């Protein structure tokens, strides 16, 4: 039996304007900084709350940031298209994607978090092993009885859009399951072998 799992994901802030906002974050009340203006940004939903807090701390210094929590995939697309100053993604941009951005790309790790698998069965207390986790998402484990609980069908719900969380989760599944790695792989959007997609 393998140990219960924990998945950690790092979130990357992508953009040429990120340096400007980070420099402003480090200024103090006594700073003579004359940096001011408005930045537009879009991307990952996971870090949106901490970004909003950081950006509200910048507002009294004259720096406004409009961050739209639209998901990692949309954030990268908007940044690549030049419609936002910077984007945020749970998955770093690949070199071939970076090459498409003529103004350049700076990728900065901003924060980290864990991905949890939630379940809705009050009659069962689970600590999933890696084999059980991959079996559930591969569709080979279909019933709670296979996990030592009373019989009840397992209904899987996963992200349907391009998601950095999906990338990190499927990267973990690829690391713990050769079957997952060979048949599904890791990306922001994958062909899930089971379950229904939702946003």
Predicted regions and their residues:
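Bacterial N-terminal signal peptides that target proteins for export
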Residues: 1-13
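Flexible loop/hinge segments at secondary-structure junctions
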Residues: 25-199
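C-terminal motif of bacterial Sec signal peptides marking the signal peptidase cleavage site
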Residues: 20-24
């Amino acid at each position: 039996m393998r140990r219960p799992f924990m998945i950690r994901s790092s979130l990357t802030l992508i953009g040429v304007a990120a340096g400007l906002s980070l420099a402003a974050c480090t200024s103090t009340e006594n700073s003579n900084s004359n940096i001011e203006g408005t930045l537009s940004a879009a991307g990952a939903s996971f870090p949106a709350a901490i970004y909003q807090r950081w950006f509200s701390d910048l507002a009294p210094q004259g720096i406004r940031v409009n961050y739209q929590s639209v998901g990692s995939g949309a954030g990268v697309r908007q940044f690549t298209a030049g419609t936002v100053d910077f984007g945020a993604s749970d998955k770093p941009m690949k070199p071939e994607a970076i090459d498409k951005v003529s103004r350049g790309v700076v990728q900065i790790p901003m924060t980290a978090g864990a991905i949890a698998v939630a379940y809705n069965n009050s009659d069962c207390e689970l600590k999933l092993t890696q084999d059980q986790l991959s079996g559930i998402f591969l569709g080979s484990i279909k019933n709670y009885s296979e996990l030592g609980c009373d019989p009840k069908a397992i209904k899987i719900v996963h992200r349907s859009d391009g998601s950095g969380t999906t990338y990190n989760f499927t990267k973990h599944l690829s690391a713990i399951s050769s079957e997952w790695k060979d048949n599904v792989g890791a990306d922001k959007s994958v062909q899930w072998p089971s379950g229904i997609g939702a946003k």
